[in-house]
Amino acid sequence: MTSINIRKLSHSEMDLYRKPLLPETWSCFPVDKEIDTQSLKKVLQKDLDRIRSGAEKDPFSNSITMLALDISRRLEKKKLNYSALEALIQRLAVGSFGLRADRLKKYIGEIDRKKNDKKLKQLIINLSSEGNKQIPFSEFKKKIEKNIFGIVLTAHPTFGMPSKMLEDLANMATMTKVDGKKITLKELKVIIKNIFKTEQRPDKNITLNYEHLLSLKALKNLQLALNSFYKQIIITVSEIYPNDYLKITPTIFSLHTWVGYDVDGRGDISWADTFNKRLKVKLEQLEIYLETIKGIEKTVQEDKLILSKVLIIKKELKESLEYNLEIYHTLDEEGFIDNIKLIQKISKFMFENKEKLLTNTKKLFHQINEILILVNQSKLKLKKKVLMDFQLLKIGMNNFSLGLARTQVRLNANQLNNAISKEIDLHGDPDDPSNKSTYLNSVSKLIDKVSPVKINFGTILTENMNAKRFFMIIAQMFKYIDQNQPVRFLIAECDFAMTALTALYFAKLFNLDKKIDISPLFETEKALATGHLVVETLVKNQHYRKYLLQRGKICIQTGFSDAGRYLGQPAAVLSIENLQRKIAKVLADNKLSSIKLLIFDTHGESIGRGGHPVSLEERLQYINCSYTRKKLDEWNIKLIQEVSFQGGDGYQYFLNPDLSYAALTRIAEFCLRPNQKFNDDILYNSPDFGVEFVNTIKQFNTNIMDNPNYAALLNVFGSNILHSSGSRAIKRQNDSGVKTLVYHPSQTRAIPQNSILQQLGMLANSLGGIGKFLRKDPKKFEEYYNKSERFKRILDSVKYAFAFSDIEVLKAYIDSFDPGMWLSWSTRTADIERSNNMKSVANLLESFDIHWRLNKVYRELHQEYMEIRDWVLGRKSKGRIAVGRGRVIEKEIRDELLLMHGIRVAIFHELFLLSVQIPKFSDQAGVSRDEVIAKLIRFDVPEAVKILRTIFPVGKEKINYSDYGEKSDYISEKDINYTIEENTIFKQLEALHECAKRVSTGITHFIGSVG
């Protein structure tokens, strides 16, 4: 069963399905029941092959543009209709989803639970011995109880498919259901059939609640996987240390979440949202503890004393759930945030019932230990099982406390700087050399004399500074949700030591410094270059040094997404590992090897944001390289590694229990593999090569980021060709008319920017600069690729990016804006009306004057692409060598991807032709016809159509002119019913735009990630 090719099976099932693929409930166009998508796909594929073969003789032709024009001609001659195109898009998107399931299965490795049990057991056995000798139990206990790896779930906007499909993806990859039962071939076909009846787009109106609930599902599966892992540890240890196995409380892994607690760049998350999301995480954990106790209750029925004590715990957990639910439902009420009386009421309720809320696990631990003494003395039939169940419960409480995961909050450095500015008279840059020391000394003096203050929920309501309010929320979470579990305090874009020191000041002010771990995030170009200096300044500050020694660790976060956007991903990954080593060296040089270095590498599933495409094992090696681990060992710096799994794309590994367990096994293999030796790597032995590699790629990407023509490329297409894939809105800074065709790329976040590049067929963040570096010395480049394990791992991502990129695709999209192409096309079109519309499009695009700008970027990227092509496919290859050869994906799959691009270019052409058919109108409400068309040309169709419907209404109530005492036969323009325009232009624009966005979903499936 596991060898089934799901992509091919999906296509064969769609061939056998004789009904239309598209239900009328959500189809964009009237369903054509006679469509044969299999035949249509073959016809267009033959067209593409024919165009390619003829194009070898014509260096100026473009196979994707030619395919799009061929589709347009078929539409013009009625040999093809929009309904057929929509159905074909559905087919290709479903096939690409099958490919995604196949890829996930391969990416995760061994999925069979019993085989993974054996792998984990062997890892535990290996930990218990050194040099073929069993180590003392005390040493083993220290090893097994260390926290060495953290899994962090985030709410990044990568929810690119319906949640049901996301769960189907996990189930198909494992061929198991959530209950662990195997999926039969018949059941798999039913899943596929349901998928091709599903609209290929994310769920509509994604909210923070939606993201949070999905993250809870993932966390529950992760806990199940961890409990299975811990059970395997106890079973194995019982065989190695039979007298001591119940004395261990293994940790190794920790679970974290920032879903609902990340307010960096978000003004839509209130303090009540954050508090309530944390409370929900507690409620779910209490439910797990209660269910465990209920299970134990059934096994101790014969011993009334033990049963009575178990029932006491059960009663306390149920009572805690009831009281916490009362708070949760109150805070969840609509309008709560503005209802002062309700806030006062629930605040008093919390204060008066604090003991019943259960805010720490000390009492539970004490009760369980008392019961364990009785169990050991008892003659219970299921004594061994009861001991195991209680031990697992204790391990769970030790690791999870009162929440499915540990809390990580995040805000932006600017929010902290603003909050402290008045107190230290901060003006301008905190790192300004003329004031830097003054600012640092001022914050230190504040810490010298700070005294903790008391706050309540009323204090939160009256505080205007976001940063201070956030500290207050954390204080209340400790007070009323969980007193014990530490909170990570992440500071985004933390380029200055003063900012982290400010966080410490506020932590002390609100009496949190013993419970939170401040973690600066280094992701900008400046931070990656100077982050170690920030840390050096902090560790030399007496207050921060004392704080670190007290916490026993220093926490930092390194961000691959923005680093990849600004520097290029190949340069970013090397810059990040270099920074991590520099920070470790700072700790060693400042005699701080007694504290642990916690590095949270935040990255996404896409290669542009730090995800490695080959396997989960390769991904872990990619972000946490062996050379860095070697240097940390030399400096005696203990490492705790954390990685992020961002949004829906990240949760995919944890929406099926067997998949979660497999993922956890791969991570355990990475962390616990014995005798991990570093083999000498030519990349580190010859640092000049690596430095020049980074600098070349960095130079290319920083230049292109500041290039207004690159900005134009991103802005013309923009996020309007994408469905919204998260609760965080993606809007341009300026959104009016023709003049907004150019802006700066930094105004777009990493995910949408990467998404746009994916959709344009050019993964520039991973490719840019590689060609330039290749040109310098191809032989040396090849030598390092063959001899350096690290360099090859980085370049494998480049090869993957190349496989899903095509310079002709980019050119086809760009040439949609070429007035010359439209004029040439108009002269070869028999339909006079359509020809005239093409001339109108040409005139329109001439006035926009954008094509030449896009072409300049194309030429720059073309040079990069061709150098990489020559390296991947061989310099002897000429012309348009067949797609697929020498690439990491086969030709058939790549051709399906190119078909999707060709179809969408044709859709864009149809959109442009419809745009110029809008009736002329005088400016209304400050909006001109040119501005509306400008919105359409940059694919902001919903907003444009909304404006048009206001100007050209349908079915407007008619005024009876006979009631005014005198006759009138005048017909006002307002009395005209624009039903024809509605049906032939406005609805068509919306439908075509939706189809274009569904293509985006399909392309996302092909590549395997959003952005």
What role is predicted for each listed range?
Residues 2-250, 272-362, 407-410:
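Extended, highly charged
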Residues 4-60, 66-118, 125, 129, ...:
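Acidic, glycine-enriched catalytic cores built around paired aspartates
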Residues 143-147, 154, 253-270, 323-510:
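Structured, charged N-terminal subsegments at the starts of enzyme catalytic cores
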Residues 240-247, 479-485, 507-516, 538-551, ...:
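Secondary-structure transition/capping motifs at alpha-helix termini
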Residues 262, 468, 483-484, 497-503, ...:
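Active-site-adjacent "gating/activation" loops or surface patches in catalytic cores
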Residues 274-276, 412-414, 421-424, 503-508, ...:
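Short secondary-structure boundary/capping segments
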Residues 407, 487-491, 514-522, 554-558, ...:
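Hydrophobic faces of well-ordered beta-strands that scaffold small-molecule active sites
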Residues 521-573, 577:
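Catalytic core of soluble alpha/beta enzymes
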